[in-house]
Amino acid sequence: EIAQKVAKEAGAIHKVLFVNELEQAEIRFNPKDRCYLCKKALFGKLKAYAEEKRVSCILEGTNEDDLHVYRPGLKAVKEMGVLSPLAMHGFTKEEVRRLAEELGVSVAKRPSTPCLATRLPYGAEIRPEILEKIAKAEEYLKKEGFPVVRLRLHGEIARVEIPKEHFGRFLKMQETLVPKLKAMGFRYLTL
């Protein structure tokens, strides 16, 4: 929905290509290079579509900051010949947000939303029902006033990650939040 909205704002065509990354066992069992394997599958599908439509290049949104942290997916970007114009021109995440806001892009202030598979430890099987459970819990916490939240699973332990400045409010609300999260199937919770 968000991509469709932004494409409409930009006057671009929006096309959804379906890829089930979890059909591939090497991705489903969450190896350290999962992002690489996943990006390779996604860009492979996109590249085939681009060739069919005679599109000469594919662009993606890596920025300068992304080049200085662990991003195994960048290897696939390079291998597949996908261009990263923001990074190529040295735009940082903050500069991208500022420019997007100046241009009136509706999602300029939207917090980043990394893949839900990052919420599971390497080697854990990624199952759709687990990802859905995590997504529901994070959505619940966002509705309760925690706009930046990650819920990471470590076996039976769910670790809630929020900015430190929200700890106090979370602790004040724990009598409401914790039972609700436990009812969603999270046995043990940490902050």
Question: What kind of feature is each model-predicted range?
Answer:
Residues 1-102, 143, 158, 176-186, ...:
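ATP-dependent adenylation/nucleotidyltransferase module used to activate substrates
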Residues 19, 62, 111-113, 153:
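Proline- and acidic/polar-enriched loop/turn elements at helix boundaries
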Residues 87-93, 97-141, 148-149:
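Mid-to-C-terminal catalytic subdomains of enzymes
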